[in-house]
């Protein structure tokens, strides 16, 4: 058995948390030879804590061989103590009549506090994935609130968008998703994201040879991927939970265990590549090895792509400006 890993999960009793925890405990995130301790954070109110207790009872009842221990708490200092990995799932959802800027402000308070708690008690090499929306800006806030931790280890989840785009291409081409490589989702985890298959291949053949159809790209593919979350809410009555949890597992597994040379999409702090301001958390194509990621460099950006990348960048710059005063 490998050494155990301490995993902090916020919003642990929520829909995504419930879909996520059992799969982590079963070994799907870190491998079938890595014991885990789950350190679960929920809101301090009675209902949330009772729900968390119920989740912990169910985890006990699964008798997972890899589950070496559990902590359930409303205290971030306890949940993040010595954490190797932190999955920041919980965030304030957008309520009726709430403006986007109000949502940003409410979440800025949460992620400032969580970043500070990570800075105080987590392992110095902790790897952080922000799932709670607006994920890119929440990750930026947490990163800026944890000055003693490695900023490169604060990431946002764009893997759900990546997986959604993979699925759409798979359907269009009648090819298995496993045979499609070099897909990218640029930018913000929001409807402005830009799924880009210009470099993608299916069975080693460039996809643009099979789908040389800019009208389908602009009018069907991009809108379907970018509005998929809203489409699921419309029919399910609830937001994506199982698919989001699955994407979180994919993101962390590939980051920690390696992508084997394959491109994946991660929201990571920019190093200035592709003209994206340094430090901004932005969706890039990356490869991963030995627990570290590298941005895929020097891909040509055509006029069509630049329009979309500029739009998602502008949105992120606006979000960052709206919360800048909270980070001074």
Swiss-Prot record:
An MF annotation (GO) of this entry: L-malate dehydrogenase (NAD+) activity
CDD domains per the UniProt record, alphabetical: MDH_chloroplast-like (cd01338)
Active site per database record: 189 (proton acceptor)
Keyword Transferase: no
Keywords (A to Z) from UniProt: NAD, Oxidoreductase, Tricarboxylic acid cycle
A Pfam family reported for this protein in Swiss-Prot or TrEMBL: Ldh_1_N
Catalytic reaction(s) noted: (S)-malate + NAD(+) = oxaloacetate + NADH + H(+)
SUPFAM superfamilies: LDH C-terminal domain-like, NAD(P)-binding Rossmann-fold domains
Binding site for substrate: 94, 100, 133, 164
EC id: 1.1.1.37
Presence of keyword NAD: yes
Binding site for NAD(+): 11-17, 107, 114, 131-133
Source organism superkingdom: Bacteria
InterPro entries cross-referenced by the UniProt entry: L-lactate/malate_DH, Lactate/malate_DH_C, Lactate/malate_DH_N, Lactate_DH/Glyco_Ohase_4_C, Malate_DH_type2, NAD(P)-bd_dom_sf
GO BP term (any one): malate metabolic process
Family: Belongs to the LDH/MDH superfamily. MDH type 2 family.
Function: Catalyzes the reversible oxidation of malate to oxaloacetate.
NCBIfam families: MalateDH-SF1, PRK05442.1
Name this polypeptide is given: Malate dehydrogenase
Biological source species: Xylella fastidiosa (strain 9a5c)
């Amino acid at each position: 058995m490998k050494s155990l890993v301490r995993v902090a999960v916020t919003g642990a009793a929520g829909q995504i948390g419930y879909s996520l925890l059992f799969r982590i405990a079963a070994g799907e995130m870190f491998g079938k030879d890595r014991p885990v301790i789950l350190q679960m954070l929920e809101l301090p109110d009675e209902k949330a804590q009772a729900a968390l207790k119920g989740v912990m009872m169910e985890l006990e009842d699964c008798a997972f061989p890899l589950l070496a221990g559990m902590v359930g708490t409303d205290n971030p200092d306890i949940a993040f103590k010595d954490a190797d990995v932190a999955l920041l799932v919980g965030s304030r959802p957008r309520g009726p009549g709430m403006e986007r800027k109000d949502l940003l402000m409410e979440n800025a308070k949460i992620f400032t506090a969580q970043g500070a708690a990570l800075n105080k008690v987590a392992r110095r090499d902790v790897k952080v994935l922000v799932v709670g929306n607006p994920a890119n800006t929440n990750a930026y806030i947490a990163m800026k609130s944890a000055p003693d931790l490695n900023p490169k280890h604060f990431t946002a989840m764009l893997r759900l968008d990546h997986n959604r785009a993979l699925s759409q291409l798979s359907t269009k081409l009648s090819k298995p998703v496993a045979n499609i490589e070099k897909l990218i989702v640029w930018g913000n985890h929001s409807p402005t994201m830009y799924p880009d298959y210009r470099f993608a291949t299916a069975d080693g053949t460039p996809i643009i040879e099979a789908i040389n159809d800019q009208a389908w790209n602009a009018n069907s593919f991009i809108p379907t991927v970018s509005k998929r979350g809203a489409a699921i809410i419309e029919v399910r009555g609830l937001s994506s939970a199982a698919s989001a949890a699955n994407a979180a597992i994919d993101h962390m597994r590939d980051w920690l265990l390696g992508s084997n040379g394959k491109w994946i999409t991660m929201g990571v702090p920019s190093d200035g590549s592709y003209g994206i301001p340094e430090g901004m958390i932005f969706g890039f194509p990356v490869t991963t090895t030995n627990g570290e990621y590298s941005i895929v460099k020097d891909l040509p950006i055509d006029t069509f792509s630049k329009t979309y990348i500029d739009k998602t960048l502008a949105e992120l710059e606006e979000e960052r400006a709206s919360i800048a005063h909270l980070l001074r």
